[in-house]
Amino acid sequence: MHCVLARILLWFLIVDLSVIRALVLPPLKDYDPLEPLMKRDMAMGQRNRFKVDGQLPPILNSTDVTDDQRSLHTPGEIPSYVINHCPLVHLYSEEKYWPSDIAEYVQNFQIKDKNGNSISTHENLTLHDLKAEYHVDLFGNKTETHIPSSEVFLTSLDDFDKDPKWLLGHLPEYGTGYNSKAPAILIVVDKGNGWVDAFWFFFYPFNHGPFIMGHGPWGNHVGDWEHSLVRFYKGIPKYLWMSAHSSGTGYRYEAVEKFKKLRKRKQQDSDDGGDTILERPLIFSARGTHANYASAGQHAHDIPFFFMPLSDFTDRGPLWDPSLNFYSYTFDGKTVTPSSEREESLGLDWLHFQGGWGDQQLPARDPRQKWCVAQWKYIGGPRGPLFKKLDRLNLCGGVKKWNFWNGGCPARRLIKKAEGLDSESTDLMGDNCGVLLYRIRPKWLRGILRFLMWRGILCSLMEFFTN
């Protein structure tokens, strides 16, 4: 009885102190580190989501860019500023499935259609075996059947449920972030009028899905493509977008945390000067799912309110530098051009492969398969880089269904703060309430509303609509 009374008194004390803090502290100290930037944007009446400000030209679809509008004039040539601003990736400290090389990965598969018929004619696949379409004699009657690659899957030769060695990937080198066995994929797209999009793709052999209230994992799949987009205007980075599951988050480039890293000058570089220290953007890769976030901590997957049963977790684990090992290409909306002989040796057909980069979803009768209300344990593998909407004008790969405001993808001006023990607070982080709060005056009223909306539904709705 005494314990119950003590808990009740403690609860009232906490509530009283919280109310006093909400009523007294906000008028004395306003927690809006980038309020001048907000005021500037509001004064400009900025509504065009394809412009940084009223002085910059529009972004064009890559297929509509004329010769006079081109930002890149030599197919296959990768600008140095793209490499210099490549994101660094903090992998999770307890990660089990690390990055891998797609050329090594495909050797462990055969190609099958959705009915289980074998499409590949030999073992030890290479990237040259991945094509846009196939013509196969399925029934042994010397009649070829046309099968589009969208109807096939890479099917494991081993039981992936037992974690064969090739499924685990490779850990980057400590200190440098170099990963000799896991090249990233870089695709640079000319968006005209000085705009250039640099897509960095990160490949992991396996996606280990999240747990729901301690049960799972759910949504596992063999093969996992994640990516980030750095959008440049005349060589200056303006935006950064990072994928997370079927969507992602876009940021103004200045809003994202940076990491100083040394870039050694190569002997063949003709310009003067020695080694250079560059400020590179940081991305945090979530445990198992490899979803990308801009901060460390717990990130709500679908339900971002008081109750977060489905979450991703990030921390400052091993640092991976994709710019030290990558395959690179340029893409004009129609033609892919390799940047060197290394990429030419891999061929280009694999980029046009529309099939799943992992096994088809296991049937319910398979003993490895399990089901929960919203998800299966094992789902089908993802599609490859060329089918991630590289021709997008919007910063995001797609518009969030619930967010029609500002095109569904406004670029955030503050990092969305995570929850949990690994979460951090910096001057770049917002309080997870939308910029609608910045319009409220007087400040003491804003402070009260900020307190009342802390991790509340209304606050999260504003975050969705205003960033």
Swiss-Prot record:
The chain crosses the membrane at residues 8-28. The keyword Cell inner membrane does not apply. Keywords: Glycoprotein, Membrane, Protein transport, Transmembrane, Transmembrane helix, Transport. Disruption phenotype: Leads to cell death when overexpressing the camptothecin mimetic TOP1-T(722)A mutant. It comes from Saccharomyces cerevisiae (strain ATCC 204508 / S288c) (Baker's yeast). The gene is TDA6. Belongs to the VPS62 family. GO terms for biological process: protein transport. Disulfide bonds: none annotated. It is found in: Membrane. InterPro entries: VPS_Associated. This is Putative vacuolar protein sorting-associated protein TDA6. Induction: By 8-methoxypsoralen and UVA. One of its GO terms (cellular component) is cell periphery. Involved in vacuolar protein sorting. It is a single-pass membrane protein. Glycans are attached at residues 61, 124, 141.
